[in-house]
Each structure stands twice: as structure tokens, then as C-alpha cells.
Amino acid sequence: MKELTPEQIQENWNKLIQLVKDTFPEDYPDNRREKLLKMYHYFEERMCLTPASGKEHFHNAHPGGYVEHILHITDFVQQIHDVWSRNGATVDNFTVEELIFAALHHDLGKVGNLAEDNYIHNDSDWHRKNQGMIYKHNPRIEYMTITDRAIWILQHFGIKMTENEYLGLRLTDGLYEEANKTYYVNWSKDNQLKTNIAYILHQADMMASKIEYDQWARGDHDIKVEKEVEVQKKTEQSKAANQAFKELFGE
């Protein structure tokens, strides 16, 4: 299982908070930025350690995986938005701020409710080893879809969203969510989605999830850690050799 160091978890959290500050203006009297920061402060301790999924063969099923995934998708939505724009797609009927808002909060429900985590550690060694179920759903909280809980949390903190943001957030999971089918598969001209925000978000989410899975499957993190350990070991050996030389022959 991939593991982030405490320093990496803190660094990712700092990046997330800075992204919120950079994206949303201080628009008094309805200061959405202030409300968002209040919400993130409330969830900080838990959100920092929240995984992005419960199974290791899905994506980012490790402490800190949620924030890491959110940083990935917010990066990818901007890249994909640029690709769509350069190739002639209509992207002028929604804003980049709306795009980032939806990307930031489409999986917010994974943090759980106001008091309890959505994911708890699986206490079954058999399921962890044989099925990769690192986490399980917390039976102490009310069942909701991740999207429904995300919207509920946002309204609890008084955070308003535009129609574009709502649809983008609501539809980020694409056809993996059965309830989204009527939005994506609609034969009526009048009822088809009128902006591309949901398509861009879904592409970015798929891209982030797939890349995270590929990195886990290849063992990229383990290889990186092994290299870092090897470099550290060589550095320590070099320091020890230099110290021994000085002790034998002086400065």
C-alpha cells in the first residue's frame, strides 16, 4: 500500500488551502472564500488522513489519498479545459472558478459527516490481504451517496454554488453513477447538457483515478521510497567515511 509521510500530507494540505485562497475572491457580503476556509478548518484533522477510496486496486486507498486526489483533479481540469478550448469546444459559458469549485468538492462526502469518518480501517485481515479492502464504510453514519453528502456538507456551512457548479459536481462521476444517466444519455435536444463543464470534470476525474491506479500497480511509490532510502544510506556512509578519514589523518 502506498504511504505518504507526515511531511507530504502536510504539504498537500497546504497546497489545497492555498488553491482555495488563490481561486476564490473575498466577495463580501457573501464571502464564499471565508466559508470554504471555515469548512476546511473544521475538517482539517480528518480530511488530511482521508483516503480517496476503500480498496487498494481502486485509487489512493491510503491516508492522505483524498487530498492528493483532489489536487490531481483540480490540476487536470485546467489542463483539459485548455485542450478543449484550443480545439474549438465551447468553454465560455462557465468559468474556471466554477470548474475548480466542482473539482474541489465532487468527492467531499468521502470525509464523512460532521462527527464521523466515511471510511474506517478494515479490521478483517483476510479482506485486506485477499480483496484489497483496506477500508470499509462506517456503519455508524447514515448512508448517503458521496455526491449527496458533499452537497449536504456544503449547504451546512452556508456555501452557495452556481447552477454550473451544481451540475458539474453532481455529474463528475459520469455513468459510473446510475442516477447520472438521464443527464448524459438524453435524446431530447432541449434536455441535453448546455455546457461542457460536466464532461471536462468527468474526464479529469477518470484521468486522475486511472493514473493513481497505474502508479499503485507499477509500485512507483515503493520504487521512489527505495531510491530515497538508498541515497540516504550512501550519504550516511559517505559522511562516516569522511569522519573516519579526519580522525585518522586530521583535517
Residue ranges and their predicted role:
Residues 59-64, 68, 80, 92-220:
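Divalent metal-dependent catalytic cores for phosphoryl transfer on phosphate-bearing substrates
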Residues 2, 16, 200, 236-240:
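Generic signature of intrinsically disordered, low-complexity, basic-rich segments
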Residues 26, 30, 121, 137-139, ...:
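Intrinsically disordered, low-complexity regions enriched in small/polar residues
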Residues 236-251:
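Short linear clamp-binding motif
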Residues 1-129:
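Acidic/His-rich, divalent-metal-binding segments that scaffold phosphate/diphosphate chemistry
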Residues 225-236:
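Acidic, proline-/serine-/threonine-rich low-complexity intrinsically disordered repeat tracts
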